[in-house]
Structures are given as C-alpha cells and as structure tokens.
C-alpha cells in the first residue's frame, strides 16, 4: 500500500510540480554539463561529460516520476501491437500454490503478451521447434515503458544473440494498490510461462530473462518452477540483467548506502516507492520474503542461471552477493558477469551509454552458458 504518497502526486500540486520540473531541469542539466568538464567533479570520473549528464537526467526523471506517482511515463498500449498482441487468461488455480496462491485481494489476472518480431506460428510441429525468449522488463514494480521504443531494441538484441525465433515482452501488473502487490507480478509470470508452454513450445527451447525488477520476477518464476508441485516443466535456463535482488522495507536507504549509487542512473526514491507498494503489509513469511527479496535466500536450481551487473551500478555488490550465494548451492550452475564501467540495466541503457558492444558480448556469453550441451 502506498502510504507515503508525496503531496505532488495529487492535483493541483502535480501540475505545479510538473511545471517547476520542466523549467528547472534544462537549466540544471546545462549547469552540470559545464561542471562536469572538470573531471574530478564528475560523479563517475571514468565516464564522459555526456554520459554523466545522461545519468543525472535519468536520476532526475526517476525522482520526478516517483514524486508525481507517474506509472506509465513513456507507454504504448498493448493493443497497438495489433496481431502481435495476445490477451492471455491465467491457468487454473492449481497452478498457483504456496506463496503465489490467490488471496482475498491479490488474484491471478489476464495479461498482455507482445510477440516480436511477429505472432507465433499456428503450425504445432513448427511451433515445437521455435526458440522463444520470455522477457520481463524492469521498472521497480511501478513503472511500465513502451513495448515499442524500449521493448523492440531489447527484443532485437535478445533474438540476435540468443538465436531465438520469438521474444515475448511480458509486462506484468504494476504495483500500487493492495490488489497488485506481491504475488501479482509472479502470478502474471506463471500465466505468461504457462501460455508459451501450452502453445506447444518445447520447454528446452525457452529461455526466461529479465532486467532490473523484471530480473527479480524471472528469479521468482525460477523459484516457483523449481519448488512448486505443478506440472509446468523447467525452461532451458534463466538470464537476468541487473536484477533487483534486495527489495526491503528500507530499499531507498539501502541503495543510497551502496558504493556507486550516487553516480548511477537510478534514484533511491523510485526503489522506495516500488518496495512500499510491492511488499504486502504486515509480517511476511520466510517463503514470501524469499520470493520478494532473493538476496540471502538462495535456492536450488536445476537449470543454469546467468547474472549480469554493471561495475558502475549501485546494485552491483548486492547482485554479486546474490550470485555467489546461488552458486554456493550444491548442483547449481551460475555464471556472474560484471561489465566494466556500465550503469544499471545494460539492455535498457546500452544505447545511451555507448555499450552496444558490451551488451552483445554479455548476451553471447549468456547464450553459450545456457546451451543445453554446455
């Protein structure tokens, strides 16, 4: 529940704050552009002036969206995808046991799958051979971005480097009400995965991926598939990029205390907002806590897990610790990659920070690691 809503999230204060932001921000960025010509003044000295300014602008935007509680700042309705859009109903209740079970408030719901580059084949024999990536996008559980301007470049990169036929852009429900807190996003992940399997796609040809909060959802789906007694098969593997693994009651404060956080693209306010509305109210069971915040809650995985983090991101050390904990579980196959001088969420930020080469290398490495014969 969003009990800490800022004053600026309601009219007329939202309009006033928006006007102030639109006037102030260009001036602020101009002043930073001048200040950052002096290398010691740059938050990240190894980055160029332009890269530091872009990171500052991202922090300002995240802070602004958090202040006015704007959940779809750059959004494209799923219906705009036309024939690539599929409205998917959730599977029967038996597929939602334990921590993801329906409650009086949080229940499985229909989801919108967006296919790239085109809808799946109707030929069952052909579909069985299709290689499909199920990708969960980031957004701190509270922000959704356009499946075109944001989703298409990510889908194109995944298709190319993972040698996949199709990518499903899987936007789960955003949190913000008691009906959309955990386990809503994981229930949606189960619905997406069940949908792809029910089409006839061979699970050995499915890779689950996610970035930032979407990486958290991908890890939660892996935990569910490993632990639940449902008959959903395991995918080939899981690849996550800058996964948000430490979703605590004090997420914003935790982030600010991390090295590199003040230079990265994220702002602590968006993480605190996300944690406030994603985490259910009251005392959580150990099982629920493990799903929400997987750091310090490693689990057995029968499929390989690839984890990437940027060495310049505020979440780097948390993600590395999560990877080490997962790798310590007997039988787990985990590969962690720290990408040099890279901010949070390489798939999302690679173009703005000139990291296309690094993204390609990371995806190629992930693909090789997740190969069945590896």
Predicted stretch roles:
Residues 112, 117-161:
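Short, surface-exposed "cap/lid" segments of acyl-processing enzymes
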Residues 6, 17, 187, 200-205, ...:
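Alpha/beta hydrolase fold serine-hydrolase catalytic domain that processes acyl esters and thioesters
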Residues 151, 165-205, 355:
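Catalytic nucleophile-loop/oxyanion-hole region of alpha/beta-hydrolase
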Residues 116, 135-139, 209, 241, ...:
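Short hydrophobic segments within beta-strands
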Residues 140, 172-176, 245, 343:
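Alpha/beta-hydrolase active-site loop signature
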Residues 210, 214, 218:
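Gly/Ala-rich beta-loop-alpha elbow adjacent to hydrolase catalytic centers
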Residues 1-127:
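A glycine/proline-hinged amphipathic helix-loop "lid/cap" segment
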Residues 114, 168, 335-339:
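General small-molecule cofactor/ligand-binding pocket signal
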């Amino acid at each position: 529940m969003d009990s800490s809503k800022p004053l600026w999230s309601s009219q007329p204060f939202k309009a006033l704050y928006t006007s102030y932001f639109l006037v102030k921000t260009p001036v602020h960025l101009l002043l930073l552009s001048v200040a950052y010509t002096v290398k010691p003044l740059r938050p990240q000295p190894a980055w160029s002036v332009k890269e530091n300014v872009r990171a500052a602008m991202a922090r300002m935007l995240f802070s602004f969206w958090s202040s006015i509680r704007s959940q779809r700042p750059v959004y494209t309705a799923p219906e705009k995808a036309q024939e690539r859009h599929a409205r998917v109903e959730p599977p029967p209740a038996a597929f939602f046991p334990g921590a993801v079970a329906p409650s009086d408030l949080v229940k499985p719901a229909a989801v919108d799958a967006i296919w790239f580059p085109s809808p799946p084949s109707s030929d069952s024999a052909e579909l069985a051979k299709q290689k499909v990536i199920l990708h969960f996008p980031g957004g701190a559980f509270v922000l959704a971005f356009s499946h075109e301007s944001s989703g298409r470049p990510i889908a194109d990169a995944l298709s190319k480097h993972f040698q996949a036929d199709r990518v499903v852009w899987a936007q789960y429900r955003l949190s913000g009400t008691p009906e959309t807190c955990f386990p809503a996003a994981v229930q949606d992940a189960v619905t997406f995965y069940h949908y792809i399997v029910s089409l006839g796609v061979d699970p050995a040809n499915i890779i689950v991926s996610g970035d930032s909060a979407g990486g958290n959802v991908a890890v939660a789906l892996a935990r569910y598939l490993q632990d639940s007694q449902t008959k959903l098969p395991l995918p080939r593997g899981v690849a996550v990029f800058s996964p948000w693994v430490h979703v605590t009651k004090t997420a914003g404060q935790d982030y600010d205390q991390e090295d590199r956080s003040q230079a990265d693209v994220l702002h602590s306010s968006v993480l605190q907002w996300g944690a406030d509305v994603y985490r259910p109210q009251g005392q959580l069971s150990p099982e629920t806590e493990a799903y929400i915040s997987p750091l310090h809650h490693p689990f057995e995985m029968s499929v390989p897990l690839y984890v990437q983090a940027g060495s310049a991101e505020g979440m780097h050390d948390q993600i590395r610790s999560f990877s080490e904990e997962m790798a310590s579980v007997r039988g787990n196959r985990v590969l962690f990659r720290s990408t040099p001088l890279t901010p949070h969420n390489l798939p999302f930020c690679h173009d703005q920070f000139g990291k296309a080469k690094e993204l390609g290398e990371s995806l190629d490495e992930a693909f090789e690691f997740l190969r069945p014969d590896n």
